[in-house]
Swiss-Prot record:
Pfam families: Excalibur (PF05901), SNase (PF00565). It comes from the Bacteria. The lineage of its organism: Bacteria, Bacillati, Bacillota, Bacilli, Bacillales. It is found in: Cell membrane. It comes from Bacillus subtilis (strain 168). The gene is yokF. Residues 219-244 have a biased composition (Low complexity). This is SPbeta prophage-derived endonuclease YokF. Residues 20-65, 218-296 are annotated as: Disordered. Inhibited by aurintricalboxylic acid but not by Zn(2+), Mn(2+), Hg(2+), 2-mercaptoethanol and sodium citrate. Neither inhibited nor activated by ATP. Gene3D superfamilies: 2.40.50.90. Catalyzes the hydrolysis of supercoiled double and single strand DNA and RNA. Involved in chromosomal DNA degradation and cell death caused by thermal stress.
Length: 296
């Protein structure tokens, strides 16, 4: 009987020890797995935070402006100015926008072109002038600087777009830093039908349609009256005759236009050069393509 009881006790003790061993094993296993799960969660959290930080850094980098101080020489038209940059006078073509023409050779004055030119002149003369370059080429094929223009920290391009005096155009990667904002500004003016957007079909993907008749007439009147000043009169003295002969040798006047052999001859009569609307203007003498020939 004692042997039976002892055997039963031994069996019971064996079962108890096995159960304890199983519980301890599960406990150890759980303890091992729990830190791993916690580590995975922490890693995912860190990755999300890292992604957010990178996105924020990219946004800050995009918004960062490296502005360069320049001095205004003069406004050319609605989307072009001349400035002194690095000690030289340079032509600046505004990035990502286009305004109606006023001085393009062999082209008429387009509606709202004069308005855009006038507004641009007002803006660039109103405060501290600065330029911002994009990632791509800083000059176009004509040698003009390509830049975003600011006056007292405010974008001139955005102002012209918001007022309906310019359209978004000439979009070439990678010079597209502000394309999204510019399109919003353009849409704002378009929705309100401001200036260039007030005429259906006036703005196209290639530019603008139509000419200003009144401006064309004014130019014709100015050109037809010009030859009268160069008509030879009866010489009163030998010096006057000599001057007339010199003018005839350096230029030819035909049908309201004046033709000079080169800029040297042209400057004898027009020391500061002539704009594209002038009878003596020739595109071959406009080397920087700013619609002004033989300027000093």
């Amino acid at each position: 009987m004692k042997k039976v009881l002892l055997g039963f006790a031994a069996f019971t003790l064996s079962l108890s020890l096995a159960a304890c061993s199983s519980n301890d094993s599960e406990k150890v296993s759980t303890e091992k797995e729990t830190p791993q799960a916690s580590t995975d969660v922490e890693k995912k959290t860190e990755q999300k935070e890292s992604t957010k930080e990178k996105t924020a850094d990219k946004s800050k980098e995009k918004d960062k402006k490296e502005l360069v101080d320049v001095t205004l020489d003069r406004a050319v038209d609605g989307d072009t100015i001349k400035v002194t940059y690095n000690g030289n006078v340079d032509t600046v073509r505004y990035l990502l926008i286009d305004t109606p023409e006023t001085k393009k050779p062999n082209s008429c004055v387009q509606p709202y072109g004069e308005d855009a030119s006038k507004r641009n002149k007002e803006l660039v003369n109103s405060g501290k002038l600065q330029l911002e370059f994009d990632k791509g080429d800083r000059r176009d094929k004509y040698g003009r600087l390509l830049a975003y223009v600011y006056v007292d920290g405010k974008s001139v391009q955005e102002t012209l777009l918001k007022e309906g005096l310019a359209r978004v155009a000439y979009v070439y990667e990678p010079n597209t830093k502000y394309i999204d904002q510019f399109k919003k500004d353009e849409q704002e003016a378009k929705s309100e039908k401001l200036s260039i957007w007030s005429k259906n079909g006036y703005v196209t993907d290639r530019g603008f349609n139509g000419c200003v008749k009144e401006k064309t007439t004014a130019v014709k009147k100015a050109t037809t009256s010009k030859p009268a000043a160069t008509q030879p009169t009866t010489p009163k003295a030998s010096s006057e005759t000599s001057t007339t002969t010199e003018k005839e040798a350096s230029s030819e006047t035909t049908g309201g236009t004046e033709t000079f052999k080169n800029c040297t001859e042209l400057r004898k009569k027009y020391p500061n050069g002539v704009p594209s609307s002038h009878p003596a203007y020739q595109s071959k003498m406009d080397r920087d393509h700013d619609n002004y020939a033989c300027e000093r």
